[in-house]
Amino acid sequence: MQLSRAAAAAAAAPAEPPEPLSPAPAPAPAPPGPLPRSAADGAPAGGKGGPGRRAESPGAPFPGASGPGPGPGAGMDGPGASAVVVRVGIPDLQQTKCLRLDPAAPVWAAKQRVLCALNHSLQDALNYGLFQPPSRGRAGKFLDEERLLQEYPPNLDTPLPYLEFRYKRRVYAQNLIDDKQFAKLHTKANLKKFMDYVQLHSTDKVARLLDKGLDPNFHDPDSGECPLSLAAQLDNATDLLKVLKNGGAHLDFRTRDGLTAVHCATRQRNAAALTTLLDLGASPDYKDSRGLTPLYHSALGGGDALCCELLLHDHAQLGITDENGWQEIHQACRFGHVQHLEHLLFYGADMGAQNASGNTALHICALYNQESCARVLLFRGANRDVRNYNSQTAFQVAIIAGNFELAEVIKTHKDSDVVPFRETPSYAKRRRLAGPSGLASPRPLQRSASDINLKGEAQPAASPGPSLRSLPHQLLLQRLQEEKDRDRDADQESNISGPLAGRAGQSKISPSGPGGPGPAPGPGPAPPAPPAPPPRGPKRKLYSAVPGRKFIAVKAHSPQGEGEIPLHRGEAVKVLSIGEGGFWEGTVKGRTGWFPADCVEEVQMRQHDTRPETREDRTKRLFRHYTVGSYDSLTSHSDYVIDDKVAVLQKRDHEGFGFVLRGAKAETPIEEFTPTPAFPALQYLESVDVEGVAWRAGLRTGDFLIEVNGVNVVKVGHKQVVALIRQGGNRLVMKVVSVTRKPEEDGARRRAPPPPKRAPSTTLTLRSKSMTAELEELASIRRRKGEKLDEMLAAAAEPTLRPDIADADSRAATVKQRPTSRRITPAEISSLFERQGLPGPEKLPGSLRKGIPRTKSVGEDEKLASLLEGRFPRSTSMQDPVREGRGIPPPPQTAPPPPPAPYYFDSGPPPAFSPPPPPGRAYDTVRSSFKPGLEARLGAGAAGLYEPGAALGPLPYPERQKRARSMIILQDSAPESGDAPRPPPAATPPERPKRRPRPPGPDSPYANLGAFSASLFAPSKPQRRKSPLVKQLQVEDAQERAALAVGSPGPGGGSFAREPSPTHRGPRPGGLDYGAGDGPGLAFGGPGPAKDRRLEERRRSTVFLSVGAIEGSAPGADLPSLQPSRSIDERLLGTGPTAGRDLLLPSPVSALKPLVSGPSLGPSGSTFIHPLTGKPLDPSSPLALALAARERALASQAPSRSPTPVHSPDADRPGPLFVDVQARDPERGSLASPAFSPRSPAWIPVPARREAEKVPREERKSPEDKKSMILSVLDTSLQRPAGLIVVHATSNGQEPSRLGGAEEERPGTPELAPAPMQSAAVAEPLPSPRAQPPGGTPADAGPGQGSSEEEPELVFAVNLPPAQLSSSDEETREELARIGLVPPPEEFANGVLLATPLAGPGPSPTTVPSPASGKPSSEPPPAPESAADSGVEEADTRSSSDPHLETTSTISTVSSMSTLSSESGELTDTHTSFADGHTFLLEKPPVPPKPKLKSPLGKGPVTFRDPLLKQSSDSELMAQQHHAASAGLASAAGPARPRYLFQRRSKLWGDPVESRGLPGPEDDKPTVISELSSRLQQLNKDTRSLGEEPVGGLGSLLDPAKKSPIAAARLFSSLGELSSISAQRSPGGPGGGASYSVRPSGRYPVARRAPSPVKPASLERVEGLGAGAGGAGRPFGLTPPTILKSSSLSIPHEPKEVRFVVRSVSARSRSPSPSPLPSPASGPGPGAPGPRRPFQQKPLQLWSKFDVGDWLESIHLGEHRDRFEDHEIEGAHLPALTKDDFVELGVTRVGHRMNIERALRQLDGS
């Protein structure tokens, strides 16, 4: 403790340097003056005689121990093992407690006992300590926390040993200062001055203040640092530290962050300060607020390994674990800190330690691709065969993570290569080990298996001398010569050269790279002093280096001591051994000798992660070899039990088969694939819905498909298998093989056989990135879990981690690619286009094809798209089901260690990748495969593979995915994505990749929308996992749809959505987090650009078509191409008439083409094509009229949209699509007809009407578009509500009116928004919308045009009454299904108007944006694509009759996974209208949604998120969303920020994903659901309300927010996923989606309180464009998945618009009346909303805010009228108002609220 001695000396009177320890105590007396008896402080620096480990015991006390001590000591010692009763006084609480404390335990343990026994909380409790009062002439002192209690002899003056528990203040020898003087000294100004002196190294001034009696134990109010911790982070602060210590600073005083000075020095890699502190008697084992030691922080932070060596040399304790069971060794491997790892192993770290997920350090290396660390572990004897709790070995984890080179290393490692440590670690001798054989002995014995030499270093009596290691190496060398004298010498020398001299410079070795050139645990204090004073004596070797690592000299070195060799830059160095003080021994060109470790860096022979295309390339290179055969390389065939069975699956039309298929993607059979017992086929069941069709037939997760309908599919690619399944229709005969490992009994069969999920690997990669992002996002949340440290550490290691993250990102993209199985390939796109009659996507193939971009963008895009579509990427969906059990939440099997949430993640991930992914399916599957891991990872940032630890690194793809799901409502991220799609097709593909780059004004907004979309996608994934194979089988469609959905949101959407996932745990509470981090990440994620590209591609490709018009109606080629990109956004936007249109408009004009070219096109192309039939519409038909109106409206908006005019005509057409849809549903149409009927156009402002007329013509022009544009697109202008657009694809165009009605009804909720419409301007739009729905009907014919693509999303808005569909001819139904407008089940039909299937036609709805803008914002109708997706679910069409409305086929198809899945059954039930994304649960919905939500929650994965997320997500998410959305709207196009945490509560991630967006609904579900149902009904009644929203249209351009709600709804709808989402969160999920409504006024938590319609109304209103819109959207949003849709809708760039009308829908849905707006519909709109003041004459849904005010007057509550009107509360909002909403509206009196609620019930009843 030379230092301590020095410190003492410095302290004031260098009492005797030779005995620094003694002096330390002495100094106290020495400075009788004002100098406080710092020594008495309780821990003399060295305490030569002190028994304490740190020799910290004050001299006096120890002497006591020796003298009087023996007796007392014995007293305390006697009890030794047994506890001793100690009386503890707590002066601050004026309490005294008698506690039994264990004398053999550290004081820290006794302190925790005391803290636990307190019944009052103490501020800054960590800085309270046990104080031994002065007695017998000895000064009182605080007991050092890391010394044993028995080392402090008890006071014999009292019957019971007495200690005080008090705040650590400076201990003064006597009262030298009176209170006044003391107070004067400790003013804020003085304390600040003191901190400044410390910062400036003003040692003299610091000493002067301390001499006056200043207490240095305080926190800086700004930074939270204390003087000692600040000094510990400074260079050359040795003297300063000594002065502070001697001035009474406590070595274990903690900063506000809970860190001691030792932690701070270690984190700063300040070896000199660390050495000084240790020499002053600090313990290396101080715990921070999380119970973690400096050594843990060192392993976590990386960098120069000298601090790690110093701590270990000073007997630092190994094996400290965080909340997730991660030890130092795990963290070192997680971040690739090789040198730290070697030091840890050398000092005895346990290589077999498992974290909460059962992952060992080798598993972590495999997961994070840390090859150098893995080599070190293997070389030192790590066991490769240890299985984590997911029953995976490190090799399997590496395969799952896609780290094939590392997997090869692990697999080929031979036991003969193991070289255990033959050297014995050296320890500092100065520390008194507790007990004769205290720590030293046990520690060496703890040596790891790699250490053959177990002889612990004899622990010499504690010697005051500094440890060898602590000295500079030069000194060390000399000391080596004479060990005995060395102690004394060392003291002096250390004082002299001590920390100052020595290889200060060298000791700070640069952070060791992967190769870990990090310094060896060299002890020398590393003062800045010259490297080596005199000759650096001989170097001392610690241990041999691991062979096989290659190093290059990065800087020259000239020898300065004996044995050193010169190095020149660029020379290859072979490292032979690691020495002390950061010196290594190596050979260079025949010269062998020592050199500083920081002069060399390890080089990786192959940089796998550097190339962005890695995943794809690597896969090509490696995956096939690992396909089937290699997975079981670890076990012999005899290890597997093969069980084959033939299952006959018979499903109903509207449902799926209930399984998710995963596997390799390939255009042609993969002949190279060799089936093995472990991996008998390329395609396998990733998940099977419990009690679903497949489940009942005996199929289980992990079963490999051998034959499908008699065709052998062992080597067949995913798409082909899906096609085979589809061909069979409702009957499927499959021959499957279950592979089970004999030894394993729990989920073994699934585990061993399941191919490693590629997604995991992707997730892994993503995980790194996702994790970091997510962790950071989650940090706040995780903090509670104690993950904060991991996060902080991650942050600290950020610089070093960054590369990993980047890699992860790029990998993530790759990974995402894997999920691309979902993603649409160029071929798929072409086929889709052909199917749709669209010209092939010119750019689509190219962009899709681009291997790299595609993989990157595709992966994410896929995810997004799938989410948006409601068909989650296969991977997600598959994973979800599997994960459900063991994925997101720790899988049950994995769950073993799910103690902390982080654990959950931790464990979750392993399961995720537990099954090896089939090689063939490699990339596609990838996306889902890793999800669990990802999640797990997320969960535990620092934990195991999938553990939170990973969080630091990029989040694994799965986690991200999960997050995205949760955040389904990504809000901002998508802006870029929107942009990308916007450009023309040709441009788009490339642009897509650059989605960010394409941020033209309009694009940008779209991009935002895109983000939304992405978010939506994320939820969709969860849902997907629920959906059966059929849905999944619509992979192409799904992909397309995803692309579509993603298209706008797409590019970054999926990825982003996922990314939030990383935050999975953390972000999920806010949901926002997601948005920002991941879900929303869409826009911001690294993959964003790729995503954009992907989206673009997808959009271009059938995907976007599939989303909107893909199958139902193929828009014109240009439309598809361009529109696709914009189509999604537009669709989404379109959904919300106002918001949607605005979004659309701002978004790619092309998508909105109608807008841009609408005017010209509209007029020129007066012929609209019927979306379903593809035949030209009669211009006079309602559909044509509606289309025309929409077109007109679009045209009027065109200018604003024009920026993205690509495919203007197409855009125009989309409007008609919607109309068409409406036309389809005659019943509904009729209901809405009065208000929205084609004749309604009259109602529409003239311009709008004209536009509507134009639209029809235009639609005719582009028959392809019309094909799927059944959406009943209410003219935008016509139907502001159109946004609501229930794209009902009624079976025939003849139901348009009714559809319109339905649409209107849905808007009913949004109608509130129309309320503003009621104002003069608004009124116009309102009526327009109404007219538009009828018009929409005609549009049906016309929508086929490009509109279809755009409209698809709009479609989502459409509510088809299921009954209606059933009533309509089956053919229509099929078409609708194709379009994605599957009619909702009859229950929904009753008035819900969930024209889910209609999603495709969604576009027209947006048309109603603003009274001013008569042009409908033609949103691409998602339905068509969805319909296409539906292909497999043609039955969906009939779903109208089916209550479940599996018909969500649009969505279901899109998110085939979720819809088909059993879950979807429920879901569909809940929200019939996926298409429109509002899954209104109408009457049924309320209940179903809950169950749905619950289901997901119930599932393991969901659960973990659910609890928190669910609740918070519902409220928070919605709220956040709302805020973001509102803000976004406010910002106009720009913000995509609304985070649509539109989680679909689907089985797949259901809960978690939904948790965010949906959580609200779920949590609020009871309310929300009921509200939703009533709202839905209201919606039905008031579809036009929604229509009114379009009024916002004009404003919406300006105020996308207004539009966005509808657009959102539309989007959702278009995203098949939306439906799925809505299905998943049947409760309010869809609504929740709508929830997103990104109203400009995010101010309302409305989002989260879906019920709070206040804001929503405004949203829907023209005013919606303002903040008002957001609120309305929220409530509606809650109801259905529309949010999802809407988010995709808003994808492109108008996040604000993203606030979709969805919320409107919600509100509407709230209205109980099932009739679709019959009365309102009949009137031209709710009449002019404004004019029709007499609220008695209108249905509640149609009330304007003024009607609401009149109604309040009528119930004698006029005093609240102003607030209600200010908040734009319209009739549709009223039923959704919650208690909080009322309070916000000024209704604070319970009586008033009850009166309002009672009056509302009477209204509902009337």
From Swiss-Prot:
Ranges for domain SAM: 1743-1806
PDZ domain location: 646-740
Residue runs in coiled coils: 1569-1589
Low complexity bias locations: 1115-1124, 1371-1392, 1444-1460, 1627-1637
Positions where Asymmetric dimethylarginine occurs in the chain: 1041
Bias type Gly residues, positions: 993-1013
Domain of life where this protein originates: Eukaryota
Gene3D superfamilies registered for this protein in UniProt: 2.30.42.10, Ankyrin repeat-containing domain, Phosphatidylinositol 3-kinase Catalytic Subunit, Chain A, domain 1, SH3 Domains, Transcription Factor, Ets-1
ANK repeat residue intervals: 223-253, 257-286, 290-320, 324-353, 357-386, 390-420
Main location: cytoplasm
Ranges of Polar residues composition bias in the record: 1495-1505
Domain called SH3: residue spans: 546-605
UniProt entry keywords in alphabetical sequence: Actin-binding, ANK repeat, Autism spectrum disorder, Cell projection, Chromosomal rearrangement, Coiled coil, Cytoplasm, Disease variant, Methylation, Phosphoprotein, Repeat, Schizophrenia, SH3 domain, SH3-binding, Synapse
Function: Major scaffold postsynaptic density protein which interacts with multiple proteins and complexes to orchestrate the dendritic spine and synapse formation, maturation and maintenance. Interconnects receptors of the postsynaptic membrane including NMDA-type and metabotropic glutamate receptors via complexes with GKAP/PSD-95 and HOMER, respectively, and the actin-based cytoskeleton. Plays a role in the structural and functional organization of the dendritic spine and synaptic junction through the interaction with Arp2/3 and WAVE1 complex as well as the promotion of the F-actin clusters.
Disease link: A chromosomal aberration involving SHANK3 is found in patients with chromosome 22q13.3 deletion syndrome. Translocation t(12;22)(q24.1;q13.3) with APPL2/DIP13B. Defects in SHANK3 are associated with neuropsychiatric disorders such as autism spectrum disorders (ASD), bipolar affective disorders and early dementia onset. ASD are characterized by impairments in reciprocal social interaction and communication as well as restricted and stereotyped patterns of interest and activities. ASD include forms with moderate to severe cognitive impairment and milder forms with higher cognitive ability (Asperger syndrome).
The protein, known as: SH3 and multiple ankyrin repeat domains protein 3
Organism field: Homo sapiens
Phylogenetic placement of the source organism: Eukaryota, Metazoa, Chordata, Craniata, Vertebrata
